[in-house]
Amino acid sequence: MTEAAAQPAEKAKSPNAPTEETVLSVKHYTDRMFAFRITRPGAFRFRSGEFVMIGLEGPNGKPLLRAYSIASPSWDEELEFFSIKVQDGPLTSKLQLIQPGDKVLLGRKSVGTLVHDALTPGKRLYLFSTGTGIAPFASIIRDPDTYERFEQVILTHTCRQVGELKYGQDLVAALKDDPLVGEHAHRLTHYTTVTREPWHNQKRITTCMEDGQLYSDLGVPPLNPATDRVMVCGSLDMLTDIKALCEKAGLKEGSNADPGEFVIEKAFVG
């Protein structure tokens, strides 16, 4: 056996190798999006809003992994993920076929910038998302710490089609019955837009910001660095545009090492 051939086996023995977890449930929302829940190792810790590597065994036993935001809050005993389906994608073409009882691989360390530690204190928290980019915010809006830090939370979700909003709609509808944050559900506002189908709000979220519709609809003033904090996750175009709008409004980009008024997740686009 060559050294190269032995490499996958050596990785499997490494203390840093992914753990094997069991799929607990799977729900398909559209032909492009699905959510699933898996077991959570007792030693696995993360901050709400972070991402982790997950995947499946690939050819020759080598793990096929991709970064996924954790959609469940840090206190949850299970781990939830919200994924796009890519028919010819090396991982998602197979991951979309998983069923309860199947095994998936979970990385041992979570990271990310969409965390409260990367923001300075503020009054209002904006969570701007497109597509599956809502996943880290599904974690954040179910975290009690969010409502201890902010008086108001505004979650925006922009998708191509109306059906793709369903995950977020179900999430927000269930919030009032959440045992830990249900009493704060009235402080969360859910604002949706659709870009490729008829909808009462058929436009990009950045257009809603630029023409002032977002703020007039919500009854709040435009972005203000004195009161507003922003997190952004989704398409590359949206990340770029909202970053520019934040900077134009005077907000400073933050990080774990240097907290600011807005943060974006640069590790991947969803």
Show which residues each predicted segment covers.
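Short helix-loop-beta connector
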Residues: 119-124, 225-226
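Reductase modules of NAD(P)H-dependent flavoproteins
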Residues: 3-8, 13-19, 156-157, 161-270
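Short, conserved phosphate/pyrophosphate- and ester-handling motifs at nucleotide-, phospho-/glycolipid
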Residues: 49, 133, 235
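Ser/Thr-glycine-rich phosphate-binding loops at phosphate-binding pockets of nucleotides
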Residues: 130-136
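Histidine-anchored nucleotide/phosphate-binding helix
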Residues: 136-148
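Ferredoxin-reductase
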Residues: 2, 7-102
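Conserved beta-strand elements of the Class I
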Residues: 125-128, 231
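A short, basic/flexible loop-to-alpha-helix module at the beginning of a structural domain
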Residues: 110-120
